[in-house]
Amino acid sequence: MTNGVVAFGEILMRLSPDGYSRFKTADRYDVYFGGAEANSAETLSQLGIDSRFVTKLPANALGDGAVTSLNRFGVDTSFIVRGGDRIGLYFLESGTAQRPAMTIYDRAGSAMAGAEASDFNWDQIFEGADWFQFSGITPALSDEMAECTLLALKKAKEKGLTTSCDLNYRSKMWAPEKAREVMGKLLPFVDYFIANDKDVLGIYDNHTWTESDPKKRAEEMEIWLTEQFGFKAATIILVVSDELKRKGTWASLYENGKFYSSPFFLADMVESVGAGDTYAGAFIAARKKGMTDQDAVNYSAATSALKFSVPGDANILNEKEVLALVNRSADDWISR
């Protein structure tokens, strides 16, 4: 790997009832592998950026399946630690019409949740890398993983790597007070902060934000968080509606005291899982490709919108498709 991105976190095996079946009547399940940092690493690789995913997986066929799922996207898995009793699971029932999606986690006691800081040799892991990415899910796994993430961040800064964090707050994993405490120790070591507004609202529920205008609220969040933690830049991705009530993505970037916002990208809903992770991966790719601030936020929001068209956790795309979406008119929806 040369000038690549190291992503650190847990990859889960996902089981989803076929189509729009309900959990209580399903007799067939589709299987996917995914996780916040893994999804970002897969996006990076497809956009031409070397990526390395670091985790701990059981030394069994299910762990092998997770590794294979990463390899097929070109992600380096050479530093995945093998051991522990089980892979984390989650179950996703797809929503439709007025019925929202439903998620059930079964990740307690997973190999990664039980991992120790000594499992990971960061001097070796960071060889050939110039960027370190994690999300708020990793330190939420256990106190040990919170400490391990802090050690990794300190080592990354010591070695001169750029660092980024996708906030990814999960209320089923920890309370806002605990999340604020732990993330408050990690975020001062972060250069680029990435989030959606709901995750910021979830953790920083003790702060007052604008309620009526999501875009204005995103900008308030970016300013406040940058002032609190000293980020080089903060960017927030939103799922919003246009004047016809169609869903789509919009993103804001705050860097060097200036705001940059993307156009609205229509996102017809096949599946939303992984859209934020895709945004994080695309944003890192844009920074590494040397794009301007405006081009970076446009590129990242477009990549996220494309994820809504793909089932499963991972986005399946190429850069040509992303650039076509960024550049085409709203009426040009057929590639000929």
Identify the meaning behind each predicted range.
Residues 53, 163-165, 193:
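Hydrophobic faces of well-ordered beta-strands that scaffold small-molecule active sites
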Residues 7-21, 246-261:
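Acidic-glycine-rich active-site phosphate/pyrophosphate-binding loop
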Residues 259, 263-329:
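Conserved post-catalytic alpha-helical subdomain immediately downstream of the catalytic base
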Residues 148-160, 182-189:
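Catalytic-core regions built around general acid/base machinery
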Residues 157-162, 229-232:
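A short helix->loop->beta-strand "cap" motif at the edges of active sites that frequently abuts
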Residues 173-256:
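Conserved phosphate/ATP/ADP-binding segment of small-molecule kinases
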Residues 1-75, 96, 115-118, 268-269, ...:
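Glycine-rich phosphate/adenosyl-contacting loop at the front of the ribokinase-like
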Residues 50-137, 322-336:
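Conserved N-terminal subdomain of the carbohydrate kinase-like
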